[in-house]
Amino acid sequence: FQAYTNTYGELEALKRKYEEALTVPDVVGLVIGTRPDCMSDALLHYLEEVKKHTFLLVEYGIESTNDATLRRINRGHTYQDTVDAVERTAGCGILTGGHVILGLPGERHEDLVAQASTLSRIPLTTLKMHQLQLIRGTRMAHEYEQHPEDFHLFDVEEYIDLVVDYIEHLRPDLVLERFVSQSPKELLIAPDWGLKNYEFNHRI
C-alpha cells in the first residue's frame, strides 16, 4: 500500500483492506505508506498484533525535517508530527520507514546534510530518498514557471555528491531502499538526467 494515505479511514474498513491483501497467494507481508499525522492509536495497536503474524513495515512521508519547508510545500504536518509517529510506531516493535525529497525550495546542500543527522536521531529502520522532480500540471510546476530562481535543480553529478555526503551523515544501521526516483518522461519537466535508477545506483 504505497500510493496515497493508506491509514486514512475507519478502522474496520482498514482492517478489511489489509486482511484481504494478506489472503492473496504469495503475499508475505504488508508495507503501508502513510502520513505522520495519520496514525491513530487504535490502528497502531491493531498493527502491533498484525506484525506478530506477518512481515510489516510502516513507511512515513517525511519529505523534510524543516517546518518552514513543510509549510512552503503545503504538507499540513510538522517535523514533530514525524518524530511522534516514528517513535510511537517503532515503540510497538513495528519496522518503521521514512521517505524524503532532496532539493525542495530553500534547502541547500548543507541543510540537507544536516537533515541526515537529524533523521538519524529517530528510530527509523529504512529510508527512501529521491531528488525533487517537477511534474506537469502540479502547483510546484506552476511556481517554477513563474519563479524559476526559487528552485535549484541538481544536475546528476551534483546530486551524486549530495547523496554521498548525505549517506555519510546517516546512522550506519539505517537500511537505504532508494536514492533516486524516475517519473514518466511525458510528465517530467525537470530534471531530466536520462538515467535509469539502476544506472544511478551503479554510479553511487
What is each model feature region?
Residues 12-22, 48, 108-125, 156-157, ...:
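Short, electropositive alpha-helical surface patch
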Residues 1, 32, 60, 98, ...:
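Conserved, mostly hydrophobic/aromatic
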Residues 39-55, 83-84, 113-123, 168:
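Short amphipathic alpha-helices and their capping/turn segments at secondary-structure boundaries
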Residues 67, 89-111, 131-136, 143-153, ...:
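Conserved strand-turn element in the central/C-terminal portion of the radical SAM core barrel
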Residues 18-25, 45-55, 87-91:
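Acidic (Asp/Glu)-rich catalytic clusters
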Residues 126, 133-204:
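Auxiliary Fe-S-binding modules of radical SAM enzymes
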Residues 2-11, 25-39, 55-82, 125-128:
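Core AdoMet radical
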Residues 37-41, 75, 104-116, 153-160:
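Active-site glycine- and acidic-residue-rich loops that bind
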